[in-house]
Amino acid sequence: ESIGLLPDGEKNIEHDDKQIINKHGAEFGFTLKEALATPTFYIVAAALCTMSMLVTALHFFQVSIFEHQGLTPSIAAWMFPLSAIIAVLTQPIVGRCLDKFPTPRVITMSLATLCAALLSMSMVSDLLTAILYAVIFGINNAFNMTLFGYLWPRYFGRRHIGSVQGTGQMIGVIGASIGPIPLGMAFDLMDDYK
């Protein structure tokens, strides 16, 4: 970038005062104060926070949910490494999707896989449906992990990425921390996950 070469065929923008600006370069970026003044920051933060809440709740209660649906704890436990392997294998595909499709479309794909994971979790009744859930949940985790690193520089640039992403990640971690609480409380009140 410093010698005029840009990634992915990006083009520079010529400013009114003949200054060349690369809107995706390292010199571009919102400060944290500027980012916090945009609705986009809160939309992205809310999306990532919500996804974190649900994913963490599923991780925390997977064994218990499977047990209540008639499966053994060992089957539930074996689905964790399967999901992890699927997530690792799927992340490059998610990265290609982010290169190829508009960002909102990929976020929609991520939310669709999260919905599919939630739905498939409710239908787990045997080993085959448990494996299906683990595969879908792994794909969802690949979307989440990739989006967490991608969205902040995509919308706010790289110059102040530490403070912007740090604040956004904090919101995501708060979501992950409180996510299991409502599900746990609901189970305590109703003695069931359905």
Residue ranges and their predicted role:
Residues 30-94, 103, 149, 179:
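Extracytoplasmic gate region of multi-pass secondary transporters
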Residues 66-67, 97-98, 182-191:
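Interfacial helix-cap and linker-helix signal at transmembrane-aqueous boundaries
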Residues 73-74, 158-168:
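Loop-to-transmembrane helix entry/capping segments in MFS-fold secondary transporters
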Residues 86-90, 140, 171-175:
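MFS transmembrane alpha-helix packing/gate-lining sites
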Residues 99-111:
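Cytoplasmic membrane-interface "Motif A"-like loop-to-helix N-cap segments
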Residues 113-125:
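C-terminal ends and interior cores of transmembrane alpha-helices
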Residues 117, 128-136:
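Paired small-residue
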Residues 143-156:
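Intracellular juxtamembrane helix-capping segments at the cytosolic ends
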